[in-house]
Amino acid sequence: MITPRSSQSLEMKVQTELEHSPKLQEEPDRSPSLVDSSVIRIGTDEQNESPAEATSSPVEVAEDPGANLFPPPLPQPRICMWKYLDIHSMHRLEKAATVEEMREVLAELLELGGPEQSLRDAIILDLFSHALIFCRQQGFSLEQTSAACALLQDLHKACVATPLGNVEECYRYFTSVLFCHGVRRPPFSIDLFKEEQLLALADYVVNTYFRHFKLYKYVFTPQVRLDLSLSYMGLQSLHLWPEEKEDEEATVEQAATPQEEEPEAVTEAEQQPSEVCILQTYIKCQLNKELRQLQQLVEERLKESEERLSNRLAALERPYQTPPSKGKSKAK
């Protein structure tokens, strides 16, 4: 939860950063969809979803095995009023009398499908419909509601930009964009929200989106699979035996002469020690060496502690000698 003291410190920090930032665009780009962003992934496993979900999902995932796994840099914070929902869209949402009607208009504006077509679209629709309900409860104007929805969309884009954990970076980006709409410093920031409205909006986003941050990342990003390969130094490289192409002929020959092939197999196994045995002996030798060093170190520590203890006991066993008293004062 953001306190007024922390908000003041964040405000000063954002002001200093905005002084050195480039000039913002006065007319931001508008997009019909709130979450149509292409996200780059490397060799990852996609979530299980139907083909309809893959086509109608607002978040597009590019399957590029050579892409970089590191998270992309977050964009510079800027004013996002009328960025995605323009004045005509906000008037249509304002005319909606019921929640169901508002959800239908919102799904049409964002080009989202129903829950039966895509679960991701249903999650996005719930996210922004609850945000609109919160804005109505707080009495936000059309400009404030549009900016709040755009802020939430930019935060969602930053969340799904990578499958790795970036909650701290997303929170810093969220607070920076939030203060771009709370401080009058054109063209970098405007005083669109009051202090109480900023705190209320920050508490709402923290208690809703950031509380379920990992769930959003799990749904909208692919799962990452990590493959490890270990190589031991000082060992011979393993050579894979070629597979037998004619299995039927080999089984027939083994059935014909079982007694002749068994001694040959035993002799070959005795002559060529397996790589597993070599690895086991090497590991045992290294473990024994480390254990001997550890045992020697423990013995030295025990000897030192015994010597210190014996010295203390000897000092305690000595008789206590009183310091020599000064001679009596001479009689007058």
Curated annotation (Swiss-Prot):
Q: What is an annotated GO biological process for this record, any one?
A: sperm flagellum assembly
Segments of skewed composition (Polar residues)? 1-10, 49-58
Q: Which UniProt keywords apply?
A: Cell projection, Cilium, Coiled coil, Cytoplasm, Cytoplasmic vesicle, Flagellum
Q: Where in the cell is it found?
A: Cell projection, Cilium, Flagellum; Cytoplasmic vesicle, Secretory vesicle, Acrosome; Cytoplasm
Q: In which tissues is it expressed?
A: Specifically expressed in testis (at protein level).
Kindly report the protein's main subcellular placement as a broad class: other
Basic and acidic residues bias spans:
14-30
Which sequence ranges form a coiled-coil region, renumbered to this chain?
287-308
What InterPro entries does the record point to? CLAMP
Region annotated Disordered sits at 1-70, 246-271, 308-332
Got a GO cellular component term for this one? sperm principal piece
Which protein, by its recorded name, is this?
Answer: Cilia- and flagella-associated protein 119
Q: What is the lineage of its organism?
A: Eukaryota, Metazoa, Chordata, Craniata, Vertebrata
Q: Encoded by which gene? A: Cfap119
